[in-house]
Amino acid sequence: MITFFISLAALVVGYLVYGSFVERVFSPDDRPTPAVAKADGMDYVAMPYWKVFMIQFLNIAGTGPIFGAIMGAKFGPAAYLWIVFGCIFAGAVHDYFTGMLSMRNGGCDLPELVRKYLGGGASKVLLAFAVFLLVMLGTVFVYSPAEILHGIWGSTTLWIVLIFAYYVVATMLPIDKIIGKVYPLFSFSLLFMAVALVAVLVVRMPQLPELWDGLGNMGKAASPSTFTDSIFPCLFITIACGAISGFHATQSPLMARCLRSERKGRPIFYGAMITEGLVALVWATVSMCFFYDAPQPGYEQIAGAADKGFLTSAPMVVNLVCKDWLGLLGGVLAMLGVVAAPITSGDTAFRSARLIIAQALRLNQCPKKNRLYICVPLFAASFAMLVWQMENPDGFNTIWQYFGWANQTLSVFALWTITVYLVRENKPYVITLIPALFMTTVCTTFLMVSNTAFGLPYSVGYAVGGMALCIAIVWFAVWKRNVSKKQI
């Protein structure tokens, strides 16, 4: 537990120290924000800062810092290092700059920022990539809550219809009508659950592996037949929302359109990511209790289910922990965490997709018919993907694994965009260059070794990942030299 408490403190210090440095690099000022200059009562709506923070936190979190941390905890204490360093030096920086650059550019979405800084070709690729990613995420978060709710009441089909209907309404309505009113309540429940679990951990003080016990893959050592993934690159794909997630780059612009002042960007964007990291640390620690502090009730159940993938293992941990540790109240909170959180992530995913497409088509979103023009084909594509997912036994796991890689690849686009911006503005670009190079290597290597992609031996994957790193370094060095010549 010592590593856990050190990690919690490190995240807080990271926000206060490194977050302050990152804010000075960007230099926010008092210029009018899009929420004021472009107020339209639909997507550009100024809201109270506390409400914007709570919505941003839930938008970027969903079940990510819960399920991702649970699946990443199998690697052992190495998960702590990735959550802490990834969150402070990569994820929070990524979220802050995508939100602030959106605010500085009239509330534009990530593809528009990519077009401005990386060029039209990269923007077109990212546009298709981002929309596909968001539709895929929304689809995943239709089926999984429906399956869980089916176990309580009604049929899966009924819940799918109801969740889809909610998505359509939430995507079409002004942002302050449902999202602005309901999301803060769900955010509070997630935070309350995390605080309650910390209290239980303090009382129980379980004997968990510490950093000084080694950074090897403890899951593989404890159960080689069940846990077969390598720490690199799998840990850095598995724990995304608790460290760095490209999905956040599609969500930060939503709240960039709702802030009255640039000076609140650090607590909103950087702070929400640090908060998500805190939640991820809690759930990683709780999960290690089940994996490594044996005997624990339900451990055999979880270990036996782990080879069946995400749907059976992560929610099982959540339910066991909340019911055994927090009682009846925990059961209610588990329902909010496992059902409400993915649904809220799903509807903001579709909303972001609508706005990205609308910006690309220059289609005003105030008229209802213009929103329908985009939403109808958007949800039709999602429905087709959902049908495929339901008719294939491993459809959910397949889509989720592709989402994990696509999600982190999106963060690569965002980090390189921010790096180019910092170079052009003569600002310290190394703060995003290093994360960009690292995530480029991670995503390339994972694409090579993943069984859902090329499935090559790890030796080959590492070699290709190393080549990608070298190519990225050379490309950046050549590009920066050309930029420096033009600036002279």
For every predicted segment, state its role:
Residues F4-V17, A130, L134-G138, A170, ...:
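Selective recognition of specific alpha-helical transmembrane segments in multi-pass small-molecule
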Residues G121-L127, V131, L158-V161, G271-A280, ...:
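Loop-to-transmembrane helix boundary motifs in multi-pass membrane proteins
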Residues M47-G64, V200-P206, N217-W283, L333-S345:
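Hydrophobic, membrane-embedded alpha-helices of multi-pass small-molecule transporters
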Residues A10-L11, A90-G106, L110-P174, A240-I244, ...:
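Helix-loop-helix module between adjacent transmembrane segments
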Residues A10-I66, K264:
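Membrane-interface "cap" regions at the ends of multi-pass membrane proteins
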Residues I2-G19, G72-S102, P111, G331, ...:
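Extracellular loop-to-transmembrane helix junctions
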Residues V202-G214, G271-L320, M390-D394:
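Extracellular/periplasmic helix-exit of transmembrane alpha-helices
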Residues G138-V142, A146-V161, A170-T171, L190-A221, ...:
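Hydrophobic alpha-helical segments and their helix-loop junctions in multi-pass secondary transporters
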